[in-house]
């Protein structure tokens, strides 16, 4: 719009989730008019991240080194292994400060419609890991979508001979949720997964 380089900046900003044309233009203008030093720092941080952040060899999350800090932490409980779809899921669980076990990132979920099969995920590595390093409990923390449920079922079948206890995250009523506003599927899951007080 203004210059070829400006248009290129806007185009690249648009690859971020939730950023459309107008938002990208506002960001570009803001960086160029008011925040040039911060824009340069952002460019440097982005360059370093793209170059230096790698996949952890053990859990397949992100790391600055071959093995991430969570996998290196001796205070983590080796008896618990939480299987998630993405590194974002690891971050979400860590923010709860309620889980002290290990993680394993699948790299997505099964989705035949999108052409994503078990071979496209880290499922084979997961099976190998639980064979080599037995765990007491494998927690399947995949999404509640059809794809997430299918992935959890597939993993359960693949590891059940090697793990004594395979569990799934509880599903149902969110904290502070009003029953009248819940969809019938969520409410049905909550009724099926009710717990003792």
From Swiss-Prot:
GO molecular function, one term: zinc ion binding
Residues of the Toprim domain: 79-174
Zinc finger (C4-type): 56-71
Taxonomy, superkingdom: Bacteria
Keyword list, A-Z: DNA damage, DNA recombination, DNA repair, Metal-binding, Zinc, Zinc-finger
SUPFAM superfamilies reported for this sequence: Recombination protein RecR
A matching Pfam family: RecR_ZnF
Name this protein carries in UniProt: Recombination protein RecR
Organism per entry: Psychrobacter arcticus (strain DSM 17307 / VKM B-2377 / 273-4)
Upper taxonomic lineage: Bacteria, Pseudomonadati, Pseudomonadota, Gammaproteobacteria, Moraxellales
Gene name tied to this protein: recR
């Amino acid at each position: 719009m203004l210059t070829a380089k400006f248009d290129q900046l806007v185009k690249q900003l648009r690859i971020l989730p939730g950023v459309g044309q107008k938002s990208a233009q506002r960001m570009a203008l803001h960086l160029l008019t008011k925040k040039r030093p911060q824009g340069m720092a952002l460019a440097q941080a982005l360059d370093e991240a793209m170059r230096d952040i790698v996949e952890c060899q053990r859990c397949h999350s992100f790391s600055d080194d071959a093995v991430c800090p969570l996998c290196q932490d001796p205070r983590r409980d080796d008896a618990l292994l939480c299987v998630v779809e993405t590194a974002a899921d690891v971050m979400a669980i860590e923010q709860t400060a309620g889980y002290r076990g290990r993680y394993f990132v699948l790299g997505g979920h099964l989705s035949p419609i999108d052409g994503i099969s078990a071979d496209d995920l880290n499922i084979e590595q997961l099976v190998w890991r639980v064979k080599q390093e037995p765990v007491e409990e494998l927690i399947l923390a995949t999404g509640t979508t059809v794809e997430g449920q299918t992935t959890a079922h597939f993993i359960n079948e693949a590891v059940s001979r090697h793990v004594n206890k395979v569990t799934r995250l509880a599903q149902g009523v969110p904290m502070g949720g009003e029953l009248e506003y819940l969809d019938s599927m969520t409410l049905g899951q909550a009724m099926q997964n009710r717990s003792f007080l």
